[in-house]
Amino acid sequence: MQLKDAKLFRQQAYVDGAWVDADNGQTIKVNNPATGEIIGSVPKMGAAETRRAIEAADKALPAWRALTAKERANKLRRWFDLMIENQDDLARLMTIEQGKPLAEAKGEIAYAASFLEWFGEEAKRIYGDTIPGHQPDKRIIVIKQPIGVTAAITPWNFPSAMITRKAGPALAAGCTMVLKPASQTPYSALALAELAERAGIPKGVFSVVTGSAGEVGGELTSNPIVRKLTFTGSTEIGRQLMAECAQDIKKVSLELGGNAPFIVFDDADLDAAVEGALISKYRNNGQTCVCANRLYVQDGVYDAFVDKLKAAVAKLNIGNGLEAGVTTGPLIDAKAVAKVEEHIADAVSKGAKVVSGGKPHALGGTFFEPTILVDVPKNALVSKDETFGPLAPVFRFKDEAEVIAMSNDTEFGLASYFYARDLARVFRVAEQLEYGMVGINTGLISNEVAPFGGIKASGLGREGSKYGIEDYLEIKYLCLGGI
């Protein structure tokens, strides 16, 4: 691992301020999806080690929450500064373990760091209220306090940003956190722990436990010390975690699956729409929860849009993310490849046509050609199921009512996108789409200042923005009598 700072490549878990192995010495191997090579290994921890991390978080909680907001903010700011100072190393580490191109990885590091900066400042803006009393001698005050020990389970597709988007508000609010990162991408998480330690985050405040998803996750959901769980991942696992957390009424934040529609109306700027589709669909090789999963294009511009999209996709450069000029890396594993192939085969069997890509890339491994399907029928599997890969199925629609009905015909409600110029239509469609987020004439909507989250089966709660810190706070009502 060639890094400027070799200490950022950690192969031990970080628990209670110490770098430790699993009790039984077992490890999990981590591979580079672009080459298949083994990068290294991390501890395969279980319930016992997780319990110790939780107990350490509980022990660290009183002192951490007692700090002033400014003191916590200063430590988060230092963590942010260290991420920016080490952006190149962190990005390289991410590309090696996750596969995304280096330019995308650098962008993610900047995005990830922004949550530490933002929520460090928000720590100073945790405001309460005074409410007129219900009797002459009564005074009512509302204060907000940290919920306590929190747990986070994060995915492999954004292995840094999904951590800071949770740890930032948790620590800013005065909570402590135990993190279980994805086993495919643990090194990004461990590098962040190294920088947190350098930033002066006290021991026990932020721990990273690597290992068995079932055992670690089971302890996080069943341990009564943990008062909140935050999870980004599939709806299936989210349902399971929510049920487990219900046993002792834990607070939960869930950012789950998506099935984003990307709508292009007749009056759209087609060049802008193609640019937006390229970003929304093929960024991170389609492995994002907010990527366009269904492209709906109105009859009048259907053929022109497809031609422009084909030309844009043809310019994508597939390869190892560390190589110069590469725009698209590999899929994370063979299972991801199989799902893309399944969706293509199903659509083609029902009448769709492949006009670009459609098969594994000549590079082999988990590389896959960016694919476009046309004349996709409404009953295709891809219309209901999130692909999580470089497949753009282009559906036709006739009018606004039809496309809104098709777009909303899903259990998911995370992100949606549409391109149109008519101002009345912009507001009409935006308000009728049943999604937590709507991108209008843009294919890139994620940032630290906006509330990220979904409705329906896409989750609960919001991350980022001034609302993101609220999920880590409890409201307490004080009634003063005899005044």
Swiss-Prot record:
Keywords: NADP, Oxidoreductase. SUPFAM superfamilies: ALDH-like. The lineage of its organism: Bacteria, Pseudomonadati, Pseudomonadota, Gammaproteobacteria, Pseudomonadales. It comes from Pseudomonas aeruginosa (strain ATCC 15692 / DSM 22644 / CIP 104116 / JCM 14847 / LMG 12228 / 1C / PRS 101 / PAO1). Belongs to the aldehyde dehydrogenase family. Catalyzes the conversion of 5-oxopentanoate (glutarate semialdehyde) to glutarate. Involved in L-lysine degradation. The active site is at 255 (proton acceptor), 289 (nucleophile). PANTHER family: SUCCINATE-SEMIALDEHYDE DEHYDROGENASE, MITOCHONDRIAL. The keyword Transport does not apply. GO terms for molecular function: glutarate-semialdehyde dehydrogenase (NADP+) activity; succinate-semialdehyde dehydrogenase (NAD+) activity. This is Glutarate-semialdehyde dehydrogenase. PROSITE patterns: ALDEHYDE_DEHYDR_CYS, ALDEHYDE_DEHYDR_GLU. GO terms for biological process: gamma-aminobutyric acid catabolic process; L-lysine catabolic process. It catalyses: 5-oxopentanoate + NADP(+) + H2O = glutarate + NADPH + 2 H(+). InterPro entries: Ald_DH/histidinol_DH, Ald_DH_C, Ald_DH_CS_CYS, Ald_DH_CS_GLU, Ald_DH_N, Aldehyde_DH_dom, Aldehyde_DH_Superfamily, Succ_semiAld_DH. It is an enzyme of class 1 (oxidoreductase). Pathway: Amino-acid degradation. NADP(+) binds at residues 156-157, 180-183, 233-234, 256, 386. Its EC number is 1.2.1.-. It comes from the Bacteria. GO terms for cellular component: cytosol.
